[in-house]
Swiss-Prot record:
Keywords: Cytoplasm, Nucleus, RNA-binding, Transport, tRNA processing, tRNA-binding. The keyword Nucleus applies. The keyword Transport applies. InterPro entries: ARM-like, ARM-type_fold, Exportin-1/Importin-b-like, Exportin-T_C, XPOT. Residues 343-357 have a biased composition (Polar residues). This is Exportin-T. tRNA nucleus export receptor which facilitates tRNA translocation across the nuclear pore complex. Involved in pre-tRNA splicing, probably by affecting the interaction of pre-tRNA with splicing endonuclease.
C-alpha cells in the first residue's frame, strides 16, 4: 500500500504528466478512500512520512507524499483513534517512532530543511499525539522527552553529559516551541476554540491541564525562560558575532534564529500564563528580562514581549492579587517612555517620526497592552467584593494610565487608536454609574473626560491625504466602484468614536455641548477668515468634521438627556420654558418658538445656515451641509426666516446643479426630504414657491437613453434595473408636486403651475407613442414613455391623498391629473407588450388613485383591458393586490367597477393558477397569486360586496369561485387557509339565511344550503384532520380559530337543521361513535367560539389518535 500511496500522490500532484484523466481520477479516489479509513491507513502514512533515504539519511519520499501521510496520522489521532483495534498500542508506537524521527531529523538532520509548513504540520501532529499519550498509563514521558531535546546535539546526546552545559539546539528548540504553542491552543488558551467544543472535550482538556500543571508546568516555564534568556543574549551579541561551537559538532544559534526563537519563546509565555501558576511566569528574574526584550529595537521580539505582558496582566486573579501584580509590574512607568519614543507625526520626539510598518505595529501592541491593564483595573473597580482600599489603589493606577490611553487614542494611525476603545468604553461606563449614584466628577475623572472628548472629536477627522469616499455617503457616480476597505474601516471607527462621545454626553451633557459648539464655531470662524484672507487656508477635512459633528449632535443629545421619544422636535432648537404642573413643557407654535432664545443646537444650525460654508469647493462639505439641513429641518419652525438662506444652496452649483453627478443624485433626494419636512412644520414661504420651481425647471426634463447591451440582454430591462440618475430625478418631480400642493389658497395659480410642469411631459408622452406607432422597433420611445409615466406619478405623489370620505368640493388640480391618467391609458394601450411600460402604468395608476381618489376610479376598467392580455403572473399579483386596496378603501364607490371586472379578472387568475410548476420561482409566484386572489375575495366580502358574486354578470362563475375557496382552505399555506375560512364564514353569515326552527325569515341564497352541507360542514373536520395541519404551530391555531368560527356561524344560521345533519348523516358516515357525535353537537350548541375552538382542537387530536 505504501507504493500505491506514493504513486497516487505523484499522479494527483501532477495530472498533466500521467496517461489521462481516468488515471488521475483513480488516484484521487484511492487517496480519498485512505482518508476515510485512517484508523487503518495511519501506519502507512507514518511510514511514508518517516522513511529515510539510506544514501544521505534524508527523507525518502517527496514533500507532497510525506505531507499526505502525515495528514492521515493527524486525522487518526484527532478523529478516528476510537475505531482502532488497539488505541493504546497505536499511540505508544507513534510516541516511540516520533522520538526516533526527531533524533534523526532534528537532532542529527536538517530539521525538515527548515520548511515552515512542514514543521508546523509535524508540530500539530505531535501536539495531538501528546494529548493522546495522557490516555496511556503514567508516567507521561513524551512532554519531558521533548523538552530534553532542546539541548540535544549530534555529537553530544543528553545521556552523555548534562544538558545545562550545552547550548540550545536551534532546530529542536524551534520544533519544541511550535509543539508547546499548539498544545496550549489545543488545551484552551484560545477562547474561541473553547467556545465551540463539546462538554466532554472540555472536561478531557481540563484533566490534561491539571496533569501538566502538577507535573510539567515548572519544567515548561524553566525551559521557555532559558530560551528567552539565551536567545536574547545571542541577539545582543549582534549579527556578526562568531559561533563558539562551530567545530565541535554542537549546534548554536546564529543571529537570525536567535531572533526567531526569542520571539517564539516569548509568545509561549503569553500562551501558558493564562493557565499555569503565575509564580512560574512572574519572578524577580523573568520580569526584568521581559522588560529588556520589550525595549529592544528588533520589532519581532518587542511585539512578542508586549503580548506576553498583556497575557500576564489579563490572567484571571482575585482583585487584591491582580492589583499587587499590576503594582509590581508598574507598567505605566515602563510604557510611557516607549510610547513617547515611538510617536509618529507632529508629536514625534525631536521631529523624528518613524512611520515604518514595524513601529506602527509596535505601537498597536503597546496600545493593546495598555488597554488590557485598563480593563483589569476597571474590573477591580466594578468588583463589589473587593476591599475599598483595593478599589482606591486600582483607580490610582488607572489614573496613571489615562495619559497613555489618550496618547494611543490620538495616534496618527487608526489601528493603535482602536485598541483603546474597549477600555475607554469601560471607563466611561464606570463614570456613568458613579453619576447615577449622585457622585460628582472631579479631579482626574473630570480632566480625563475633558481631554477625551477633544481627542475623540479630532480623531473623527479624515486624514489630510485622504480621498473622500463618495459612495459611502450616497454620492457615487453611476460607474463608480465600491469604496475600498480602508474607507469602510475609517467610517466604522467614526461610529465607534461617536459611541464614545455619546457616552461622554450621557455623563456630562454640558461638556459635550460646549466642546462641540467650540469646535463648530471655531471652524466656521476660521472658514470666514480664510474666505476673506487670500493667504488663509482651511482644509475640507476640517469643515467636514465640523459638519459631521453637528449632524450627530442632535441624536447624541436626545439620548443623553433621556428624551429619545421627543426626538428632534422644534423645541430642541430653543431654550424652552419650564415644564408645567404635569411635568411636560408646553407645545409651542412657530410664532412662540420664534420669540424664544436659541439653544446650543439652534445656535450651531443658525450659524451653519448663515455661514456660507456650503460654498467651500469640495463635495464632502456641500453634501454634509445638506445632510445637516435635512436632519435639522425642524429648526426652521423656530426660525422660518432662515429658510431663505438655506434653499438657494440646494438649487445652484452646490446642490442639484453640482458638477458631480453622484452629488446631484444625493442632493435630489435631500431636497425632497427638506421640502417635505418643511411642509410638515409649515415653514415653506409661500411667496418663494414659484422661484423654487423655476430653479428646478431645467431639471424637470426627461431624456431616456438606451444603454449599451450584449446580444443576450434586453435594453429596456437593463435601462430600468440600476438606480441611476433618473431614479433620483424622480425626487425632483415629487418635490415639485409638494411645492405646488402648498398653493391651496391660490387654486388658479396652483393649476397654472401644475400644468406648466405636467403638460410638456404629457405632450412628450403623446409624441413618443406616435413615434413608436410609426416605428415599432423604436425602443427609445418605449423607454421615454416609461420614464414619463414615473415622472408624472411622482409629481402626483407630492400632493396629499384625498380622503375617500371627504365631502369637500373636488380641488381644481384633480382635473389635471385626470388628464394625465387618460394619457397613461392611451400609452399603455399602444405599448402593453412591454413589461417596463406595464409596470410603470400600474405604478402611475396606483399613485393617481391615492392622490385623486374617486375621480380616477372610472379609469380602472380601461387599465385592466389594456393590461390583462399581456400581464404576467407576477404582474397580476401586483395588480390584484392594488385592486384589493381600492376595494378596502372605497367600498361601495367601486362596487359597479368590481362587478364589471370580476369575471375577466378571475378567469385570468385561474389561467395562471392552473399552470404547471417547473421550478422554485414558479412555485413562489403561484403561492403569491393564491394569496392575492384570496385577499381580493376577502376584501370584497369585508366591504359588503357579496352581491357582486351573484350579479347577473358573475353568478355563472359563483360555483367555481366557491370551490376555489374550499380548495385553498386545505391546499395552501396557513395564511391563505386562514383567509379562505374567513371568507367562508362571512359568506355563510350573509347567504345561509336561517332555518324555521330559529324563527327567522331570512332568505337563503338558492343552492347555498346544499353547498354548506356538501362542502363546508365536511371541511370543518377534514381540514384540521390533515397530517399537514400542525396543532403546535401558532399560524395553524389561527386557522383553527377561523374553522371553529365557521362551525359556530353555520349553527347560528341553520340551527337544529345542522345538528340533525351531523347526528344522522355526516358523523355516522365517517364512523364517528354515537356518544362522541352527541358530545360534539352538545359542545357546538352550548360553548362560545373561544371555548369551542379548544374543544375542536381536542376532538380532532383524539380522532387522529393523539
Amino acid at each position: 500500500m505504501e507504493e500505491q500511496l506514493i504513486q497516487a500522490v505523484e499522479i494527483a500532484s501532477n495530472p498533466l504528466a500521467n496517461a489521462g484523466p481516468d488515471v488521475t481520477s483513480q488516484a484521487l479516489q484511492f487517496l480519498e478512500h485512505l482518508k476515510t479509513i485512517t484508523h487503518e491507513s495511519w501506519s502507512v502514512g507514518w511510514s511514508v512520512w518517516s522513511a529515510r533515504n539510506p544514501q544521505d539519511n534524508g527523507p525518502k519520499y517527496s514533500q507532497n507524499a510525506r505531507m499526505f501521510g502525515l495528514m492521515l496520522v493527524d486525522d487518526f489521532l484527532a478523529n478516528r483513534i476510537s475505531l482502532s483495534t488497539d488505541p493504546a498500542a497505536a499511540v505508544a508506537t507513534l510516541q516511540q517512532s516520533a522520538v526516533e524521527y526527531i533524533q534523526n531529523e532534528y537532532v542529527a538532520g536538517s530539521g525538515d530543511a527548515s520548511v515552515a509548513y512542514i514543521k508546523n504540520k509535524f508540530a500539530q501532529v505531535l501536539a495531538v499525539l501528546l494529548l493522546q499519550t495522557y490516555n496511556l498509563p503514567p508516567p507521561y514521558t513524551l512532554l519531558p522527552t521533548l523538552l530534553s531535546m532542546i539541548r540535544a546535539h549530534p555529537a553530544a546526546s543528553p545521556s552523555q553529559q548534562s544538558t545545562l552545559q550545552l547550548p540550545i539546539n536551534p532546530l529542536t528548540t524551534d520544533l519544541v516551541l511550535r509543539v508547546l504553542h499548539d498544545l496550549s491552543v489545543t488545551l484552551g488558551s484560545d477562547v474561541t476554540l473553547r467556545a465551540v467544543r463539546s462538554k466532554e472535550r472540555l472536561q478531557r482538556d481540563a484533566v490534561i491541564r491539571d496533569e501538566i500543571r502538577a507535573n510539567h508546568a515548572s519544567n515548561i516555564a524553566d525551559s521557555v525562560w532559558r530560551i528567552v534568556e539565551e536567545g536574547f543574549n545571542r541577539v545582543n551579541q549582534g549579527e556578526h558575532a562568531s559561533n563558539p561551537n562551530s567545530a565541535s559538532g554542537v549546534r548554536s544559534m546564529n543571529f537570525t534564529n536567535a531572533v526567531d526563537l526569542t520571539a517564539a519563546a516569548t509568545k509561549i509565555v503569553e500562551d501558558y500564563v493564562s493557565w499555569i501558576d503565575i509564580n512560574l511566569v512572574v519572578t524577580n528574574q523573568t520580569v526584568p528580562l521581559l522588560f529588556n526584550v520589550l525595549h529592544h529595537p528588533i520589532p519581532k521580539i518587542r511585539t512578542a514581549a508586549a503580548d506576553a505582558l498583556h497575557g500576564i496582566v489579563s490572567k484571571g486573579m482575585k482583585p487584591a492579587d491582580k492589583l499587587s501584580l499590576a503594582q509590581a509590574l508598574n507598567l505605566p512607568q515602563v510604557i510611557t517612555p516607549l510610547e513617547s519614543r515611538t510617536r509618529t507625526g507632529p508629536s514625534a520626539q525631536n521631529g523624528q517620526s518613524d512611520t515604518s510598518d514595524s513601529n506602527i505595529e509596535f505601537r498597536e501592541h503597546l496600545a493593546h497592552l495598555t488597554n488590557g491593564l485598563v480593563l483589569e483595573m476597571c474590573k477591580i473597580l466594578e468588583e463589589s467584593a473587593a476591599e475599598e482600599s483595593t478599589r482606591a489603589a486600582a483607580e490610582d493606577l488607572l489614573n496613571s494610565l489615562l495619559p497613555l490611553v489618550l496618547a494611543f487614542l490620538s495616534d496618527e494611525y487608526d489601528d493603535a487608536s482602536e485598541q483603546t476603545f474597549s477600555g475607554v468604553n469601560m471607563i466611561l461606563s464606570i463614570y456613568k454609574k458613579a453619576r447615577r449614584r449622585g457622585a460628582e466628577l472631579t479631579g482626574a475623572r473630570a480632566e480625563f473626560l475633558s481631554n477625551l472628548i477633544g481627542v475623540a472629536l479630532q480623531k473623527m477627522r479624515f486624514d489630510d491625504e485622504a480621498e473622500w469616499p463618495a459612495g459611502s455617503f450616497g454620492a457615487a457616480e453611476d460607474d463608480d466602484d465600491d469604496d475600498d476597505e480602508e474607507d469602510a474601516k475609517f467610517l466604522e471607527m467614526r461610529r465607534s468614536l461617536q459611541t464614545i462621545v455619546g457616552a461622554i454626553a450621557a455623563i456630562d451633557d454640558k461638556l459635550f455641548s460646549t466642546s462641540v459648539a467650540q469646535l463648530v464655531l471655531s471652524t466656521f470662524a476660521s472658514f470666514e477668515t480664510s474666505s476673506s484672507d487670500s493667504d488663509g487656508q482651511i482644509s475640507w477635512q476640517q469643515i467636514e468634521l465640523a459638519l459631521y459633528v453637528i449632524h450627530f449632535y442632535g441624536d447624541v443629545m436626545t439620548t443623553a438627556t433621556a428624551a429619545p421619544k421627543v426626538g428632534l422636535s422644534p423645541a430642541m432648537f430653543v431654550q424652552s420654558p419650564e415644564a408645567g404642573s404635569k411635568g411636560r413643557a408646553p407645545k409651542l407654535g412657530n410664532e412662540a418658538l420664534a420669540g424664544l432664545p436659541l439653544s446650543n443646537l439652534g445656535e450651531m444650525v443658525q450659524k451653519l445656515v448663515q455661514s456660507n460654508v456650503s460654498s467651500f469647493p469640495h463635495p464632502a462639505v456641500q453634501l454634509q451641509f445638506f445632510e445637516c439641513l435635512v436632519r435639522y429641518s425642524n429648526f426652521f419652525a423656530a426660525r422660518s426666516g432662515c429658510v431663505l438662506d438655506a434653499l438657494p444652496a440646494f438649487l445652484d452649483w452646490r446642490g442639484v446643479h453640482h458638477e458631480k453627478l453622484g452629488v446631484c443624485k444625493r442632493v435630489n433626494y435631500l431636497l425632497y426630504r427638506f421640502v417635505r419636512d418643511l411642509r410638515a412644520v409649515a415653514a415653506v414661504p409661500m411667496d418663494y414657491v414659484e422661484r423654487l420651481l423655476q430653479g428646478l425647471q431645467d431639471l424637470l426634463v426627461v431624456r431616456a437613453e438606451l444603454p449599451q447591451v450584449d446580444a443576450d440582454e434586453d435594453p429596456l430591462i437593463k435601462a430600468t434595473a440600476p438606480a441611476g440618475y433618473f431614479d433620483s430625478q424622480l425626487y425632483l418631480f415629487e418635490t415639485s408636486g409638494i411645492l405646488v400642493s402648498l398653493l391651496n389658497n391660490a387654486p388658479n395659480d396652483q393649476v397654472v403651475l401644475l400644468k406648466a410642469i405636467s403638460e410638456p411631459l404629457s405632450e412628450q408622452m403623446r409624441q413618443a407613442v406616435q413615434a413608436f406607432q410609426r416605428n415599432p422597433t423604436d425602443l427609445t420611445s418605449v423607454l421615454q414613455v416609461h420614464h414619463l409615466m414615473l415622472a408624472l406619478s411622482s409629481l402626483s405623489k407630492g400632493f396629499p391623498d384625498l380622503s375617500p370620505t371627504s365631502t369637500q368640493p373636488e380641488p381644481q388640480w384633480v382635473g389635471v391629473f385626470k388628464s394625465i391618467t387618460e394619457q397613461v391609458l392611451v400609452s399603455i394601450g399602444a405599448m402593453n407588450s412591454f413589461s417596463v411600460v406595464r409596470e410603470a402604468a400600474r405604478g402611475a395608476f396606483a399613485r393617481m388613485v391615492s392622490t385623486c381618489g374617486k375621480a380616477v376610479l372610472p379609469y380602472i376598467p380601461g387599465l385592466i383591458d389594456a393590461l390583462l392580455s399581456e400581464v404576467t403572473s407576477a404582474e397580476l399579483v401586483d395588480f390584484v393586490n392594488f385592486l384589493s386596496l381600492v376595494v378596502n378603501k372605497y367600498k361601495d364607490d367601486v362596487r359597479s367597477i368590481v362587478d364589471q371586472l370580476l369575471l375577466i379578472l378571475v378567469e385570468r387568475i385561474f389561467f395562471f393558477l392552473n399552470q404547471g410548476v417547473t421550478g422554485t420561482d414558479d412555485a413562489v409566484e403561484k403561492s403569491e397569486l393564491q394569496k392575492a386572489y384570496m385577499n381580493l375575495l376577502s376584501s370584497m366580502v369585508q366591504s359588503g360586496m357579496e352581491s357582486v358574486f351573484v350579479s347577473d354578470k358573475n353568478v355563472g362563475q359563483l360555483e367555481t369561485v366557491l370551490q376555489s375557496v374550499v380548495f385553498y382552505s386545505t391546499n395552501s399555506d396557513a395564511a391563505c387557509q386562514r383567509t379562505a375560512f374567513s371568507i367562508l364564514h362571512r359568506l355563510v353569515a350573509s347567504w345561509a339565511g336561517s332555518s324555521a326552527v330559529n324563527g327567522s325569515t331570512e332568505a337563503t341564497l338558492p343552492g347555498f344550503e346544499r353547498f354548506i352541507y356538501e362542502h363546508l360542514v365536511p371541511l370543518i373536520f377534514e381540514a384540521p384532520a390533515k397530517d399537514t395541519f400542525d396543532f403546535k404551530d401558532a399560524q395553524s391555531q389561527i386557522v383553527l380559530t377561523e374553522i371553529s368560527t365557521l362551525a359556530k356561524t353555520i349553527f347560528q344560521k341553520r340551527g337544529d337543521e345542522m345538528i340533525q345533519f351531523l347526528l344522522e348523516v355526516y358523523l355516522p358516515g365517517i364512523n364517528c361513535p354515537p356518544q362522541l357525535a352527541q358530545d360534539f353537537t352538545t359542545n357546538l350548541t352550548t360553548l362560545d367560539s373561544k371555548a369551542f375552538k379548544k374543544y375542536l382542537d381536542a376532538f380532532i387530536t383524539r380522532s387522529r389518535g393523539g
